[in-house]
């Protein structure tokens, strides 16, 4: 049997960097209020002419460079996004075109919001383990600034745009050690964008609707449990985890998971202060940041975990 390992990572952030003080000039908020509740200081916002596929393609190019691969060697593309360029075709096929990949490899999107990268990575791992792919491009990319109500201070301060990518390649021994995905649609009202496109118009609100306390309570509980489950099912202990690479939504949620596992924040790759919540992009963005900064080194054990609307959540234990 062949296994899958990460052979390269890349990320991209739009040039426009927006501070908490910038937002305080537009809505009734402050740097102190945002930082105390979320840990967020900055977020990046895509330019008007930048689409999700543009962010994704640039992150992918950087991941390919890191892996030492030509785009033509990719035989699977999966893009995790809740903010696609258009209703169809998939953002993955648009990225395929922008990268000049003409080998006919499968390309499709996965939508699990902030857990999307976990779903995409797990799917790509299964493709490689089955022998259906050798080099998969797995991307998380979002332009959440376009589904945020910039007059709603409870949500507009939280989100940012960006993209992260990994190249997952066939290997003789496991890089992806174990993964677990979960979902529960009974909580869909806590976090959603209710608007629908039909008959030439948008029916319902096109903006994010969120019950912050409800999301926080569920996230803390389920992320702790799935972290425990993935580690135990793999035959590992929390002490063997070198780095947690979490979904970067809220510093307090991240701290809660680390505390539950008995790990200090020194073992957490933290980027929420610089990126805000970039949904499906946040984990691969943090992963690439940790690798390029020299924090994460080859041979180390990483726990990736995240949760998004639905709810959908997941965790992946891997050796980098």
Curated annotation (Swiss-Prot):
This is Beta-ketoacyl-[acyl-carrier-protein] synthase III. Belongs to the thiolase-like superfamily. FabH family. Homodimer. NCBIfam families: fabH (TIGR00747), PRK09352.1 (NF006829). It comes from Neisseria meningitidis serogroup C / serotype 2a (strain ATCC 700532 / DSM 15464 / FAM18). Keywords: Acyltransferase, Cytoplasm, Fatty acid biosynthesis, Fatty acid metabolism, Lipid biosynthesis, Lipid metabolism, Multifunctional enzyme, Transferase. It is an enzyme of class 2 (transferase). PANTHER family: 3-OXOACYL-[ACYL-CARRIER-PROTEIN] SYNTHASE, BETA-KETOACYL-[ACYL-CARRIER-PROTEIN] SYNTHASE III, CHLOROPLASTIC. Residues 248-252 are annotated as: ACP-binding. The active site is at 114, 247, 277. One of its GO terms (molecular function) is 3-oxoacyl-[acyl-carrier-protein] synthase activity. One of its GO terms (cellular component) is cytoplasm. It is found in: Cytoplasm. It catalyses: malonyl-[ACP] + acetyl-CoA + H(+) = 3-oxobutanoyl-[ACP] + CO2 + CoA. The last Arg residue of the ACP-binding site is essential for the weak association between ACP/AcpP and FabH.
């Amino acid at each position: 049997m062949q296994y899958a390992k990460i052979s390269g990572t890349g990320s991209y952030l739009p040039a426009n960097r927006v501070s908490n003080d910038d937002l305080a000039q537009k809505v009734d908020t402050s740097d102190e209020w945002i930082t105390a509740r979320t840990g967020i200081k900055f977020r990046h916002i895509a330019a008007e002419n930048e689409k999700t596929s543009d962010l994704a393609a640039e992150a992918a190019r950087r991941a390919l460079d890191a892996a030492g691969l030509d785009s033509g060697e990719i035989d699977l593309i999966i893009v995790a996004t809740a903010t696609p360029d258009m209703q169809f075709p998939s953002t993955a096929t648009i990225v395929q075109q922008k990268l000049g990949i003409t080998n006919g490899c499968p390309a499709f999107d996965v939508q699990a919001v902030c857990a999307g990268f976990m779903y995409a990575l797990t799917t790509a791992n299964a493709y490689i383990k089955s022998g259906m792919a050798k080099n998969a491009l797995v991307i998380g990319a979002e332009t959440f600034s376009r589904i945020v109500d910039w007059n709603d201070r409870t949500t507009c301060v939280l989100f940012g745009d960006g993209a992260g990518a990994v190249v997952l390649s066939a290997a003789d021994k496991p890089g992806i050690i174990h993964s677990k995905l979960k979902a529960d649609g009974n909580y869909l009202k806590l976090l959603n964008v209710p608007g629908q496109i039909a008959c030439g118009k948008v029916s319902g609100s096109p903006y994010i609707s969120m019950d912050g306390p409800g999301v926080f309570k569920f996230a803390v509980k389920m992320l702790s449990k799935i972290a425990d489950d993935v580690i135990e099912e793999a035959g590992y202990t929390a002490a063997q985890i070198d780095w947690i690479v979490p979904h970067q939504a809220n510093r307090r949620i991240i701290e809660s998971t680390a505390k539950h596992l008995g790990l200090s924040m020194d073992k957490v790759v933290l980027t929420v202060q610089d990126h805000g919540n970039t949904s499906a992009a946040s984990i691969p963005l943090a992963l690439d940041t940790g690798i390029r900064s020299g924090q994460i080194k080859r041979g180390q054990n990483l726990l990736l975990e995240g949760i998004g609307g639905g709810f959908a959540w997941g965790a992946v234990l891997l050796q980098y």
